[in-house]
């Protein structure tokens, strides 16, 4: 298939993820991406655009975001103010129509990639309010009495953190993929992209420690890929040797610069207790 997505030089994609992206493109369906925080959901859309050489548009959703904002907004307040000031711009209502992210993507002269990020942050009706526009690739502007149609159907990537369940009618129109947290082999590839000259011994010890922390039972917040990369950056900057990460020193229950990985005191104490018990039982 021409123009297949195969990942990029800075985004390691699994075979499953590549297949999902390419399937969504073939079907002309939005690609709904779920997964743990830090698994590259948001970055994916940008990398698809880079790989396929397409323009990129992004719409980051907040709890207050309404579907209409993605289409357009009519600035009635500015028009009223300009009318009172005798501004000639008021004669053309188009001067007060603010294009949204969907409109900008629909206007693209070549097929774009559109990211709708964290759709589950909005209210429960938000996905349903976009059904018609995403299905038909058009919407009506009441103020100007015109229909805006997409010049090219965008490649749409929608991310969700599972904060809310999405409506069935919306899900039926999507191709779904869950990004699993990277295993050691995939994580090694990811780290290599960011730190190509990292010594193998330090990489091995860092990954061993990282996954040991993630596997700690009862951990409130597991460290993510981005936090691992931050930690490795600090290890390199501080010239921390690999042997420090595997030290059996009873006074060093947690790894150096742990603040990049453990983000609350409960998790710090929990990990300290687990390491202490494991070392005591090993004697």
For the regions a protein language model found, what residue spans apply to each?
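C-terminal regulatory/interaction module of P-loop NTP-utilizing enzymes
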Residues: 1-283
């Amino acid at each position: 298939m021409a123009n297949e997505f195969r990942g990029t030089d800075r985004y390691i994609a699994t075979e499953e993820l590549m297949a999902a992206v390419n399937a969504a493109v073939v079907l002309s369906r939005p690609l709904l991406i779920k997964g743990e925080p830090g698994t590259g959901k948001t970055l994916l859309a940008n990398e698809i655009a880079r790989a396929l050489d397409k323009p990129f548009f992004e719409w980051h959703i907040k709890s207050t975001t309404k579907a209409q904002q993605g289409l357009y907004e009519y600035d009635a307040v500015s028009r009223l103010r300009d009318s009172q000031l005798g501004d000639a711009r008021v004669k053309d209502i188009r001067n007060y129509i603010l294009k949204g992210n969907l409109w900008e993507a629909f206007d693209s002269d070549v097929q774009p990639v559109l990211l709708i990020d964290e759709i589950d942050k909005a209210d429960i009706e938000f996905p349903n309010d976009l059904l018609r526009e995403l299905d038909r690739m058009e919407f009506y502007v009441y103020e100007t009495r015109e229909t805006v149609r997409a010049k090219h159907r965008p490649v749409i990537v929608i991310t969700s953190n599972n904060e809310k369940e999405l409506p069935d009618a919306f899900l039926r129109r999507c191709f779904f993929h869950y990004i699993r947290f990277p295993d050691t082999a995939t994580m090694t590839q990811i780290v290599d992209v960011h730190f190509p000259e990292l010594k193998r011994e330090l990489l091995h010890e860092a990954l061993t420690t990282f996954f040991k922390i993630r596997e700690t039972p009862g951990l409130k917040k597991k460290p993510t890929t981005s936090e691992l990369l931050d930690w490795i950056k600090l290890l390199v900057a501080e010239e921390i040797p690999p042997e420090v990460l595997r030290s059996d020193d009873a006074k060093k229950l947690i790894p150096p610069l742990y603040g990049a990985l453990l983000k609350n005191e409960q998790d710090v104490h929990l990990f300290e207790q687990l390491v202490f018990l494991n070392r005591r039982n090993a004697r």
